[in-house]
């Protein structure tokens, strides 16, 4: 009978492989018995939206804050599903969720027919008051025209107010804002 001499390195690799197999099988069996406690849901559609100001003139009817929570991701401004401010200093858009939620991310659909770069640098802030000093969830980097992008908070944030704040002199336009919150599963 031949004996197999394993080197120390081979023994360590085999032990590590066994631990990995054991860990995976244990996690799979445990997760089968833990029910999902939460579901993710867009709670913005239940809220009330406001903004710092509104584009005036022939397009003011297309510029309302509530357009960003109408459930329509159409990114073409002239179809009437986007918001638009007047281009002043530090514009903001806010949704009052009417109650506090545990928020995990915010999804924004950018204007698609032009001007996609305008939103660059916007801050997404979430908190319990309607001011501009609430904690930051994320900062908007470069978004292309018409792009829909999800901005994840580094940890779930408790808040009633979600604000998109643009700290510069610029137009702020949003075609949809979804606030993704954790709700108890039924």
UniProtKB/Swiss-Prot annotation:
GO terms for cellular component: extracellular space. Keywords: Calcium, Disulfide bond, Lectin, Metal-binding, Secreted, Signal. Ca(2+) binds at residues 67, 70, 72, 81, 175-176. GO terms for molecular function: calcium ion binding; carbohydrate binding; fucose binding. The keyword tRNA processing does not apply. Alpha-L-fucose binds at residues 84, 111, 118. Disulfide bonds join 82-175, 114-115, 137-153. SMART domains: FTP. Residues 40-186 are annotated as: F5/8 type C-like. Residues 1-32 form the signal peptide. Gill mucous cells. A motif (Cell attachment site) lies at residues 111-113. InterPro entries: BG_Antigen-Binding_Lectin, FTP1, Galactose-bd-like_sf. Coiled coil: none annotated. Homotrimer. Belongs to the fucolectin family. Acts as a defensive agent. Recognizes blood group fucosylated oligosaccharides including A, B, H and Lewis B-type antigens. Does not recognize Lewis A antigen and has low affinity for monovalent haptens. This is Fucolectin-6. It comes from Anguilla japonica (Japanese eel).
């Amino acid at each position: 009978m031949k004996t197999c001499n394993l080197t120390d390195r081979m023994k360590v690799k085999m032990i590590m492989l066994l631990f990995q197999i054991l860990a995976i099988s244990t996690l799979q069996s445990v997760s089968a018995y833990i029910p999902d406690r939460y579901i993710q849901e867009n709670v913005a559609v239940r809220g009330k939206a406001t903004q710092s100001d509104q584009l005036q003139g022939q397009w003011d009817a297309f510029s309302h804050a509530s357009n960003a929570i109408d459930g329509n991701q159409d990114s073409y401004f002239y179809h009437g599903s986007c918001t638009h401010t007047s281009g002043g200093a530090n514009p903001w858009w806010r949704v009052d969720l009417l109650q506090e939620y545990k928020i995990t991310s915010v999804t924004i659909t950018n204007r698609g027919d032009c001007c996609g770069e305008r939103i660059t640098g916007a801050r997404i802030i979430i908190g319990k008051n309607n001011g501009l000093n609430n904690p930051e969830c994320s900062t908007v980097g470069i978004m292309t025209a018409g792009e829909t992008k999800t901005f994840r908070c580094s940890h779930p944030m408790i808040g009633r107010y979600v604000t998109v704040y643009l700290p510069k002199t610029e137009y702020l336009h949003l075609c949809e804002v979804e606030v993704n919150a954790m709700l108890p599963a039924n």
